[in-house]
């Protein structure tokens, strides 16, 4: 031990978020990794990876990076500029109570929020069960046969319902009827969706204005946006007689007291599960739902959880009917829906489990009683309350007093809804207190208390619900919080999320979702703001949105952004609509051809189809680059009608193509616009800007590049950036600027998760974001280098480099050993890893994206696992292992395998503890390999009957 002669200060920064917390490898580890790859410096690797022509000229510079504490202080200062009033605005957004056991153990739990979409069912059984509970809940309450596992928001679900109605209707009409009592944002989104497809939208009173022979479908709001509760049974019957489809947009809480849409004969029901314990959050995120009749289930959009069996015959859950989806069907898909709202659907399903049918019914009754009491007080003041029958929403005509009363209510701490120029609306909810009613009465000039009135009900007797719901045992479990906590824990333990291991999914960017970034989303100043409050009550939100927009413009080289799209797919849709509207404004509405490479994300052609574009497919060369000869020929062939091209950069093959500028120039030469898919932006931030390359519009996946967690399949955010000439054509919204083109129910999409991306930017700074990009490229090249002797890295640049991801070819194993890409993926589960992206963009391959957040130790563990798998395949090739009875074909191995009778020609240790697997903290798959074919042939998409649990236990 040495004794220092004088005190020395250290330059170590313990709270340097970018270099100590977000970026995985240490400087010493980076040096080791660079040596393996063959470079002396990180800059040397970056120079070899990115073509000089696409490098941005100036560094990404803004204020110095903040520590976690400084960023949280900044977020708190900003949040405090929002005013949290009691909002009775309604219009699809309501106060609700998130049970603390759900907030702490799901919303704030990385085991739930860092998981990926459950494409690998064996390691997703927990959230698949929670989603099956959600589907069962929705089916029960809507009275329909089958429900999906969530959509983006109620208005989007309504637009999807219209599109589905057109697909399945026997009627050949090209018009869709919309109940004028639908929420305004729903009407706006339906108009947006219908116009490019050539469908006319008729808005009116369904009882006087609907002629079923003129439409392919109709949507009714139940209860209506202004409170009316109507029986649509007769109208639905008339629609069916005309070969048209009925859609009912229903309030999920009201359905506990009211006759279900299914009992009215509805074909499709849509709505939001927000009021089942999910905060309003200035518009989102919230899980929408869709339920349909069994006969039309294959035309339903979105993901669908079903029941199957595993290799032992035990019950297992999986995503069913995936051939409907965009990643397989592309432009023929039912929708471009990709990321949905899984985390929020899980919360809503747990709200139903937490309360059970009795609890939810009691909440609904209490909400209704509050609304009746509110009406009685207003009637005592001499106002006529409309409608006569209602659930939670009433409207009063106050004439010229509207503004005065609205301001008086705000002074009392309450937001009411402005309806037209003379009316005021209000929607009561679970959080409404007696003091709130009395405050509203004072705003109207009253001075009495809630004790002055007797509770009663004003629901129409003919529509009172008599059918059961939530009858499955899962909704009748013991209400003790200890049981609820353990149930949530049991489900999360079945899943593999980022809190356990790296998830190296190519094109998915499963990077760190730092705890400091997540904390603010549950602050009331962000979570309890209604999306339609007056602007002066959301100044903090606006400040954050403005600064985040400025930062994203700096990152991308674009001039303007819209934060409205609430998923990447919605961003594509919004961007293509923007291009379409630009052409129309220039008198070139005939431009409807979209050039898309065969390697594109499946959402690209699906989104193009949704805006009425004709998809022309461009070939890709053997090296993964776009075939410029074919691209040039098709651009010239369709020059007169060319609307745009859609490209991904770096390419979906994980390489920076050198012809990207030439592509942009060629499209512009022929009058088109360039849409650059921002899914791979994690390889560009700080190094290259789409707007400088020649792109006109991009969406950014904030749930990839900018740290919003994937949530097991949502939420996400897909804001779009555009060059100045496209800015006037960005989406509008009826509640803000009144312009057309809304693509999400709320003006700023899922606004309450934007603090995550903003705090990430604040803590990283421009220099940190740039370093993150460089390390993402380093990590991918390190893996590619370590694996290249065992596997062929399919695509590389001229310099032999990959971008932020690499594709390894497992196809040769099929011929040499019979080992498929599925076998490799399932064997990785035994090693404690989520498989990389399988069979995309090339069948039989694995696309690996490690991100910048993974340490060298974790990268090495993954490489050891992949190398060991190759050795197992080699043992099959050499005859040292059986070709069908081996660890790869039998993977994943479960505890049941370990303790059961062992008759396999390899050891238990080899099966369960391959290289890469932890011994002490090993992840065990809860099921063996899931039978996909069985699940689709025997489709069950609600909770199995209780008898099946007994059978499974035998």
UniProtKB/Swiss-Prot annotation:
GO MF terms held by the record: glycine binding; glycine dehydrogenase (decarboxylating) activity; pyridoxal phosphate binding
GO CC terms: cytosol; glycine cleavage complex
InterPro entries: GcvP, GDC-P_C, GDC-P_N, GDC_P, PyrdxlP-dep_Trfase, PyrdxlP-dep_Trfase_major, PyrdxlP-dep_Trfase_small
Known cofactor(s): pyridoxal 5'-phosphate
Domain of life: Bacteria
Keywords recorded for this protein, A-Z: Oxidoreductase, Pyridoxal phosphate
NCBIfam families: gcvP, PRK04366.1
Function noted in UniProt: The glycine cleavage system catalyzes the degradation of glycine. The P protein binds the alpha-amino group of glycine through its pyridoxal phosphate cofactor; CO(2) is released and the remaining methylamine moiety is then transferred to the lipoamide cofactor of the H protein.
Identification of the protein by name: Glycine dehydrogenase (decarboxylating)
The species this protein was found in: Rhizobium etli (strain ATCC 51251 / DSM 11541 / JCM 21823 / NBRC 15573 / CFN 42)
Originating gene: gcvP
């Amino acid at each position: 031990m040495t004794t220092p002669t004088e005190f020395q200060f250290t330059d170590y920064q313990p709270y340097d978020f970018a270099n100590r917390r977000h970026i995985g490898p240490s400087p010493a580890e980076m040096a080791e990794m660079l040596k393996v790859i063959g470079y002396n410096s990180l800059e040397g690797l970056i120079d070899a990876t990115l073509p000089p022509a696409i490098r941005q000229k100036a560094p990404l510079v803004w204020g110095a990076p903040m520590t976690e504490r400084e960023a949280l202080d900044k977020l708190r200062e900003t949040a405090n500029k929002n005013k949290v009033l009691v909002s009775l605005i309604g219009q699809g957004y309501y106060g609700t109570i998130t049970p603390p056991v759900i907030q702490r153990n799901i919303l704030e739990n990385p085991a739930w929020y860092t998981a990926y979409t459950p494409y690998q069912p064996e390691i997703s059984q927990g959230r698949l069960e929670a989603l099956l509970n959600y589907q069962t809940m929705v089916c029960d309450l809507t009275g329909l046969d089958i429900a999906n596992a969530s959509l983006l928001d109620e208005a989007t679900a309504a637009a999807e319902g219209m599109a589905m109605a057109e697909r399945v209707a026997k009627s050949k009409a090209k018009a869709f009827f919309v109940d004028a009592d639908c929420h305004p944002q729903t009407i706006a989104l339906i108009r947006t969706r219908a116009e490019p497809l050539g469908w006319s939208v008729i808005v009116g009173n369904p009882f006087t204005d609907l002629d079923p022979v003129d439409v392919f479908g109709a949507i009714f709001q139940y209860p209506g946006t202004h409170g009316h509760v109507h029986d649509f049974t007769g109208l639905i019957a008339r629609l069916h007689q005309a070969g048209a489809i009925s859609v009912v947009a229903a309030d999920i809480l009201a359905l506990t007291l009211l006759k279900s849409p299914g009992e009215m004969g509805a074909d499709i029901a849509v709505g939001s599960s927000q009021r089942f314990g999910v905060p309003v959050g200035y518009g989102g995120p919230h899980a929408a739902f869709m339920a349909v009749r069994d006969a039309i289930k294959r035309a339903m959009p979105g993901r669908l959880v079903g029941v199957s069996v595993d290799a032992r015959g035990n019950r297992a859950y999986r995503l069913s009917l995936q051939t409907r989806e965009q990643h397989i069907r592309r432009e023929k898909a039912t929708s471009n829906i990709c990321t949905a709202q899984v985390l929020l659907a899980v919360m809503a399903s747990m709200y139903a489990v937490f309360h059970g049918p009795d609890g939810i019914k009691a909440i609904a009754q209490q909400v209704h009683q509050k609304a009746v009491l509110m009406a009685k007080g207003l009637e005592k003041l001499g106002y006529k309350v409309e409608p006569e029958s209602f659930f939670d929403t009433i409207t009063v005509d106050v004439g010229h007093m509207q503004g005065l009363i609205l301001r008086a209510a705000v002074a009392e701490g309450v937001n009411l809804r402005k309806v037209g120029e003379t009316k005021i609306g209000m929607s009561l909810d679970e959080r409404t207190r007696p003091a709130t009613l009395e405050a509203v009465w004072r705003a109207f000039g009253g001075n009495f208390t809630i004790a002055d009135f007797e509770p009663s009900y004003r629901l129409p007797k003919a529509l009172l619900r008599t059918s059961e719901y939530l009858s499955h045992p899962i909704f009748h479990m013991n209400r003790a919080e200890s049981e609820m906590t353990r149930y949530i824990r049991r489900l999360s333990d079945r899943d593999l999320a980022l809190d356990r291991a790296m998830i190296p999914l190519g094109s998915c960017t499963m990077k760190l979702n730092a705890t400091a970034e997540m904390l603010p989303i549950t602050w009331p100043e962000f979570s309890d703001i209604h999306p339609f409050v007056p602007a002066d009550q959301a100044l903090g939100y606006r400040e954050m949105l403005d600064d985040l927009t400025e930062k994203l413009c700096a990152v991308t080289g674009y001039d303007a952004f819209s934060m409205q799209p609430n998923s990447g797919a919605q961003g594509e849709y919004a961007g293509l609509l923007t291009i379409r509207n630009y052409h129309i404004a220039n008198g070139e509405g005939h431009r409807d051809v979209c050039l898309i490479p065969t390697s594109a994300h499946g959402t690209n052609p699906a989104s193009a189809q949704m805006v009425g574009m004709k998809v022309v497919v461009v070939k890709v060369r053997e090296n993964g680059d776009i075939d410029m000869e074919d691209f040039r020929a098709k651009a010239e062939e369709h020059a007169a009608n060319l609307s745009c091209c859609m490209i991904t950069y770096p390419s979906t093959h994980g390489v920076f193509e050198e012809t990207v500028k030439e592509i942009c120039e060629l499209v512009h030469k022929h009058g088109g616009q360039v849409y650059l898919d921002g899914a791979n932006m994690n390889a560009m931030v700080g190094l290259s800007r789409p707007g400088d390359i020649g792109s006109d519009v991009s969406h950014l996946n904030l749930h990839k590049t900018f740290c919003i967690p994937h949530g097991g399949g949502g939420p996400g955010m897909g804001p779009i950036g555009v060059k100045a000439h496209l800015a006037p054509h960005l989406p509008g919204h009826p509640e803000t600027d009144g312009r057309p083109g809304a693509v999400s129910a709320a003006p700023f999409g899922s606004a309450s998760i934007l603090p995550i991306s903003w705090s990430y930017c604040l803590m990283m700074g421009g220099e940190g974001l740039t370093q993150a990009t460089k390390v993402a490229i380093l990590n991918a090249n390190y893996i590619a280098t370590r694996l290249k002797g065992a596997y062929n890295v399919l695509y590389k640049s001229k310099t032999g480099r990959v971008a932020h991801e690499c594709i390894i070819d497992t196809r040769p194993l099929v011929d040499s050993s019979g080992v498929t890409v599925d076998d490799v993926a399932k064997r990785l589960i035994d090693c404690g890893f989520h498989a990389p992206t399988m069979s995309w963009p090339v069948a039989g391959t694995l696309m690996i994206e490690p991100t910048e957040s993974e340490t060298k130790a974790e990268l090495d563990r993954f490489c050891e696992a992949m190398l060991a798998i190759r050795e197992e395949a080699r043992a099959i090739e050499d005859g040292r292992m059986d070709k069908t009875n081996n660890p790869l074909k039998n993977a994943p191995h479960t505890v049941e395998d370990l303790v059961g009778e062992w008759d396999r020609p390899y050891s238990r240790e080899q099966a369960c503890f391959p290289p890469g697997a932890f011994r002490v903290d090993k992840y065990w798959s809860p099921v063996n390999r899931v039978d996909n074919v069985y699940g689709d042939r025997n489709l069950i998409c609600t909770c199995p009957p209780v008898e099946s649990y007994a059978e499974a236990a035998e």
